[in-house]
Amino acid sequence: MKNEIINYIKEVGPVTMEQLADQFGAGSAKSFTDLVKLVSSMEGQRKLVFDQDGRIALPAPKVTRNRVTLQGIFHAHKSGFGFVTIVEEEDDLFVSRDNVNFAIEGDRVEIAIKKVADRLKGTAAEAEVIDILEHSLKTAVGLIVFDEDRPEYSGYIKSKNQKIAQKIYIKKSPLVLTGTEILKVDIEAYPNKKRDYFVATIRDVVGHKDDVGIDVLEVLESMDIVSEFPDEVLAEADRAPESPSEKDFEGRLDLRDEIIFTIDGADAKDLDDAIHIKQLKNGNLELGVHIADVSYYVTEGSALDQEAIKRGTSVYVTDRVVPMLPERLSNGICSLNPNVDRLTQSAIMEIDRKGKVVKHWIGQTVIKTTFRMTYSDVNDMIAGNQEKLATYKAIVPSVELMVKLHETLEAMRYKRGALNFDTSEAKIIVNKDGLPVDIQLRQRGIAERMIESFMLAANECVAEHFAKLDLPFIYRIHEEPKSEKLQKFIDYATSFGLTVYGTASSISQDALQDLMERVKDEPYADVLNMMLLRSMQQARYSEQNHGHYGLGAEFYTHFTSPIRRYPDLLVHRMVREYGHNPAEKAEHFEQVIPELAKSSSSLERRAIDAEREVEAMKKAEFMQEFVGQEFDGVVSSVVKFGLFVELPNTVEGLIHVTNLNEYYQFHERTLTLQGEKSGRVFRVGQPIRIKLTRADKMTGEIDFAHVPSELDLVEKNLKAKRKTMSHSNRDRDDRSGRGRGKNRKKEAVGRDSGRHKSGKDSKSKSGATDKKKKPFHKEVAKKDKKKRR
């Protein structure tokens, strides 16, 4: 909401508190008080000021030596230049390599404007870093390298982060280093005019370069994602009981006689959610979503709680999970294993035929699950597998009701404008040595979508319950997309000849739904879906309820995964505490929620970054075996420096413009590259044949080369033939005749080279090369086989 306030004042000028309250709907005493506190907080951060008339205004830009200066966050590019994001500005400011002045990725900097943007000429603003207010890089991880030229240091490490070019030299250490150690170091000094490198001290030896899984561990440690728990945290977890006692059941609704079951992946160990479902006499359905009561064992302020706050979320990478809580809890007392008593928090909803929750109850329960189901079990039952239907005969009626309710809820969400971002997701299979052996597409059957649907219903129900009680609460919000990003998506969609109903500022979710429905069977549907997703804002946690745009929901929170997300744990705590003494606890939660929401959002982004970096690294490592092979893909993105192409197994690589056969001009509005001579156009969603030329595990980068199609080769041969005929005509007109044979010989070699390259070589690449190395993906292999036939 801070950005919305800033943008509003930027647009209309200084305002009174009453004007601000009207603009943001702060009509109740509670919401007005919240707004006053927020404005006060922003004043303390120098984001707002009060002018001489007592109105709320933006602070005047600081002027240093007759220059306007601003503060922002520096984002580096591996080529040396960068951009600065200013909270109060829409566009980032470009900083050339000469004006970076030793700022590094993530630094909070002060900048001076060197050149003002000129929208008529299409030129962007440029800035110069004049001061580094706060360094972001505090630690680094890397392999020790000895340097005889600097004997005053133990050596240096080079960060894997491509945006940090400088070496990190390490102060002399009593440790005996062999050159195989992966070190974690604390930065003590930063590059400056006198010294073009960092200086650091050793904090820890993470491992050795040939250790199994050290590559993944290096990524995690570089982001301060630590697997090991402190001793006091483990000791506290060990004090949790093996099973709850009768005393623990006091004040809880006893649901042990209900048919309740879990549905998870086959390899899941932390079974933290379960459901029950039944038909009521009035025709409505009762859905119970039961979540492990983690907050009963993780009390506020405890060592477990403090560690969970620091971690924010569990992190899932290819070969491991870095949990938010010790396994003693997640796989033990907080896992809803079958036929044992477990403490839970439940949302029990009565849902009518239209998918509306007409009654609900939220509170503490005790349950005993009857079955531990897997997604494949349930999908088989839905598909009519007789063996599974016989094995789980007792819950067949429940599964039938689940399918019915899921369809109702899905239709309800679609009707209210929920957007379906159904993108392909990779599952990287690694062996015991941590090496990738396969990349598969994650499958999402009806069972997976049903459980997701029921969890969404519970999250909405809990959020609406506390919003209407007007109590301090933490929400999961997804704000409306910014109009300029949505405009880029609309421009892009229309470049396919699609009609988009509405403008960037007025387009409805219904119109976006309609658009995606119209293209769902087109070859570019997945890419258009991804482009729409990229136009959205990031979902985050907030003490203010702004609804969830993507879900079309007025109220939303996270209630269903307290084992792996701290906001869910906090919600469970509020459910309990507000049930006992809401007035007393409201003030406390009002104070702690804003900071917890902010830190949880930040830690979630860190986890996503780690997961993406490990995935890119493992994909590149997997593809190294297939360098030189050709495959079919789809253009997934077009930028001024080239094309990104995605293969059927979700691997993405770059065809750089310098590897195309002519000069290509980039058209930003349509996101296309057009050949200057041929007029050929590359666009997103276009099928393309590529050759894998490079796969770099260290950087996670993959490079492709474009393989011309048969049509390209025909055109090329026709042009060569026309050129030859033109030369022949000139030769006949040449009276002297000298050089005629030489020219013809050169032309003949050129034609033979062209045929050889497009004929024999192409056949060898698509045939012999593929036979020499096994195809990396069954779908691609089938396509290649069909083409050879």
Where are these regions (language model features)?
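Intrinsically disordered, Lys/Arg-rich low-complexity segments
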Residues: V714-R789
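Conserved catalytic alpha/beta cores of large enzymes that bind or transform nucleotide phosphates
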Residues: S314-Y414
